[in-house]
A protein has these predicted regions:
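Active-site neighborhood of phospho(di)ester-bond hydrolases with catalytic His/Asp-centered motifs
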Residues: 1, 22-34, 54-57, 125-130, ...
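Pre-active-site segment of Zn-dependent metallo-hydrolases
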Residues: 1-27, 39-43, 105, 131-144
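Active-site HxH/HxHxD metal-binding segment of metal-dependent hydrolases
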Residues: 13-85
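Structured loop/turn residues at beta-strand edges in well-structured enzyme cores
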Residues: 21, 48, 93, 144, ...
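Active-site environment of divalent metal-dependent phosphoester hydrolases
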Residues: 31-38, 59-63, 85-88, 105, ...
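Active-site-proximal loop/helix segments of hydrolase catalytic cores
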Residues: 39, 101-168
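Binuclear metal-ion centers of metallo-dependent hydrolases, dominated by the metallo-beta-lactamase
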Residues: 52, 67-91, 138-140, 163-203
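Beta-strand-turn-beta hairpins that frame and shape the catalytic cleft
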Residues: 86-96, 118-124
Length: 203
């Protein structure tokens, strides 16, 4: 259903070839295989030696015990719903994590984090595979306005997802991710997204 990172780009990341040469921090929203590959992450930690890895605390998959972090600092975050934790990255940059439910009742026990990246006066909200809960995001976002939100296409396709942006999250831009490449798109996700953008996205 979803596309893996193409091998050529994956190798550029591993070998820190520009534009992937300045990565100092790595963060994961959750550990589903379309977001996280333990072998590739361990290889990257060994070869690129980033400063910090941020991820949910996890008991379902036991990821922490399988990581080969080396000199990389590991922040495994476990918080009650509704709370957040901020990590200072540099003088004008921080990463704030807060737990959210994963979309889909079958995934309700999956450890999942959203992130707010603040850098040089800009704020970006990363939703991962969050549930489409406008009440929850109104509580977490408060009066904040984001410069961009990174969301999966179902936030546009589903009425519940659209309500999150209509009622709860204020943002200048929405960046949609998690789209398969054309050759992998067996369920016509790209066509769905194209039609949704025509219908719901207006200048």
């Amino acid at each position: 259903m979803f596309s893996p990172v193409p091998p050529c780009i994956r190798e550029q990341i591993m070998k820190r070839i520009p534009p992937f040469d300045g990565i100092r921090w790595v963060a994961f929203t959750h550990f589903h295989e379309d977001h996280f590959d333990l072998d590739l992450v361990n290889r990257y930690l060994q070869e690129a030696a980033p400063e910090m890895l941020v991820m949910p605390e996890d008991t379902q998959y036991g990821v922490s015990s399988k990581l080969k972090a080396g000199v990389c600092s590991t922040e495994a975050i476990e918080l009650p719903m509704g709370q957040c934790r901020s990590i200072r990255l540099w003088e004008t940059g921080s990463l704030t994590a807060f737990p959210s439910r994963h979309a889909g009742r079958e995934y309700e026990k999956v450890s999942h984090l959203c992130y707010v990246l603040e850098a040089d006066g800009k704020k970006v909200l990363i939703l991962g595979d969050s549930d489409y809960d406008s009440v929850f995001f109104k509580q977490m976002a408060g009066a904040m306005e984001f410069d961009a939100v990174i969301a999966n296409p179902l936030f546009l396709h589903l009425p519940r997802g659209r309500r999150v942006f209509a009622q709860s999250i204020r943002t200048k831009e929405i960046i949609f991710c998690h789209l398969p490449f054309a050759e992998d798109d067996q369920i016509h996700f790209r066509n769905m997204m194209s039609e949704d953008m025509k219908q719901y996205c207006h200048p």
